[in-house]
């Protein structure tokens, strides 16, 4: 067995680093609560179909977020994400934050791997000193506008493992800790050397 001198720690964001899911919280912050609720009502049949696993969450999530943000200038969206970091900091879980800092002090390379959109996750997480944020990302057209489509696959389930391997390809070289709270973290748990559901 190869001795693993290096250590990597992977944290989910929504419900793991934060006390709750941030998608609708961010949408309300960016678009207002009224528009957020209109979208929820309009897309409730599609959300129900997704929960019954008739369509995958990637397609449902893309349709919903497209309704809110398609056509928005990327720079405006990015700035909203930067501003949201101040609010999101109040949602951090003290226990998970302490664990993240512990892993950093041990010399782990730390990644946040999230199905949420990079622009509202990265500003906060990078300020915590993580090495990188691996997440879902919006496509931006040549005019600098959001197309409403994702430029990468929704970073959920097995996609989380794929994204980690892009930045940490030599799996035999490191001991992997994984932390999450939902079924979207199952494949990462199975891929890790040690995991904890928080």
Describe every region a protein language model picked out.
Residues 29-32, 83, 194:
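Residues within well-ordered alpha-helical secondary structure of globular protein domains
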Residues 15, 77, 133:
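A residue-level signal for conserved active-site and pocket-lining positions in enzyme catalytic cores
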Residues 60-94:
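Metal-dependent phosphoesterase signature
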